[in-house]
Amino acid sequence: MAGHSKWANIKHRKGAQDAKRGKIFTRLIKEITVSARMGGGDAATNPRLRSAITAARAQNLPKDTMDKAIKRGTGELEGVNYEEVRFEGYGPGGVAIIVDCLTDNNNRTVADVRHIFNKYGGNMGTHGCVAFMFDKKGQIMFDAEGINEDAIIEAALEAGAEDVVHEGDSFEVLTDPNDFSDVLEALATAGFATPSEAEVVMRPQNLQQLDEQQASTMLKLYEKLEENEDVQNIYANFDISDEIMETLSA
């Protein structure tokens, strides 16, 4: 069942950098708040909130912080009213990009995201123009060091996962979105309790290989989107060879 997912590995490394900047906590808090606002504060009856809490626990977000985020969503505490916005478009080399945002000022966010696309060789498209190139999946990432491949594959499949992908220094466990929380909990029970990342994502069906120039520009576009305070998640279907990544990292 093991395969390869270069994009997941790139995203995994970038996710580690993101965590160091602390943005990931802000992103998780906003998702919990919006989930509670849309579906209520009971995770047992609100699947989106349950997934958000599961992802937050995987990143060690304090329980008190989660509880306050839920209360802001249900109106028990005062908070910002965020609107969900999804942008779709293309980057260098025809890369398909989805950008999910939570914003308190839609006009500002539209202008900011469009500016980033235009500045770094991309262009915004219409709703639905690239979403069909992605599948919604639960994604649980583990650092590969110290993990037996056969053991994690067996545990994941027994837990109800769809696939396990080994790429570089990480394992990626894929699930149906509805099974995400159950699989994560079952993996923890089986001894795999410390994922580096766990969330429901839009996973590309195929990857677009980029040359060095395209890769350089695409990574700049990605990083600028990532730095925007309204951006929650970025999904893209690009692939960069190890050789080009080494050159760009030098």
From Swiss-Prot:
The record's subcellular locations are:
Cytoplasm
Q: Looking at the Swiss-Prot or TrEMBL record, what is one Pfam family this protein matches? A: TACO1_YebC_N
Name one cellular component (GO) term: cytosol
Question: Which GO biological-process labels does this protein carry?
Answer: regulation of DNA-templated transcription
Provide the alphabetized UniProt keywords. Answer: Cytoplasm, DNA-binding, Transcription, Transcription regulation
Question: GO molecular function terms here?
Answer: DNA binding
Tagged with keyword Glycoprotein: no
Identify the domain of life.
Bacteria
**Record's family?**
Belongs to the TACO1 family.
Please state what the protein is called.
Answer: Probable transcriptional regulatory protein Mmc1_0479
